[in-house]
């Protein structure tokens, strides 16, 4: 099994989209790469902790490659906008790809380079090692499953 952590604005929609992909075996939402230990949702929303809202993804490489998974990710974000996705504004809504294994970096960079060809503006999506991940509160986990009419800025069709 492999793991990747993706930031694509509000984490509810990113998780709902990713968990529908064949080969994804686990998802959970949380906060990554900030400077405060175990922050609360309210703290992250203050834009003072440095965290991004993220979706942790564990996937089976025999069913889906990191490259294909990233292709899905690029479809649901605007990678040229900084600190915003849809109507959600703030540094916690930035886009990012946070990896735990150095060998994934080449695939991630190649994926970004392929996507850049589709845009006139530069892609501003962060690509960084995962420094810290904290689970979000339970009420955020599988939020759109628990609240089918809940807010989501992305198209959940795969």
From Swiss-Prot:
EC number(s) reported in the record: 1.8.4.11
Highest taxon of the lineage: Bacteria
One GO CC annotation: cytoplasm
Catalytic activity: L-methionyl-[protein] + [thioredoxin]-disulfide + H2O = L-methionyl-(S)-S-oxide-[protein] + [thioredoxin]-dithiol; [thioredoxin]-disulfide + L-methionine + H2O = L-methionine (S)-S-oxide + [thioredoxin]-dithiol
NAD in keyword set: no
Gene3D superfamilies: Peptide methionine sulphoxide reductase MsrA (3.30.1060.10)
UniProt KW keywords: Oxidoreductase
GO biological process: cellular response to oxidative stress; protein modification process
Catalytic site positions: 10
Entry's Gene Ontology molecular function annotations: L-methionine-(S)-S-oxide reductase activity; peptide-methionine (S)-S-oxide reductase activity
HAMAP family given in the database record: MsrA (MF_01401)
Family affiliation: Belongs to the MsrA Met sulfoxide reductase family.
Function: Has an important function as a repair enzyme for proteins that have been inactivated by oxidation. Catalyzes the reversible oxidation-reduction of methionine sulfoxide in proteins to methionine.
Name of the protein in question: Peptide methionine sulfoxide reductase MsrA
Organism listed in the record: Alkaliphilus metalliredigens (strain QYMF)
Underlying gene: msrA
């Amino acid at each position: 099994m492999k793991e990747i952590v993706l930031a694509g604005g509000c984490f509810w929609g990113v998780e709902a989209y990713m968990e529908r992909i064949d080969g994804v075996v686990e998802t959970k939402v949380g906060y990554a790469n900030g400077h405060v230990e175990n922050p609360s949702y309210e703290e992250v929303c203050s834009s003072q902790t440095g965290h991004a809202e993220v979706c942790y993804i564990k996937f089976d490489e025999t069913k889906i490659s990191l490259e294909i998974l990233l292709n899905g990710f690029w479809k649901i974000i605007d990678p040229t906008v900084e600190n915003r996705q849809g109507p959600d504004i703030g540094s916690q809504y930035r886009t990012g790809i946070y990896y735990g294994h150095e060998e994934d970096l080449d695939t991630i960079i190649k994926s970004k380079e392929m996507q850049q060809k589709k845009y006139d503006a530069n892609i501003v999506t962060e690509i960084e090692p995962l420094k810290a991940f904290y689970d979000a509160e339970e009420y955020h986990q599988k939020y759109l499953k628990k609240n089918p009419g809940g807010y989501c800025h992305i198209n959940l069709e795969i």
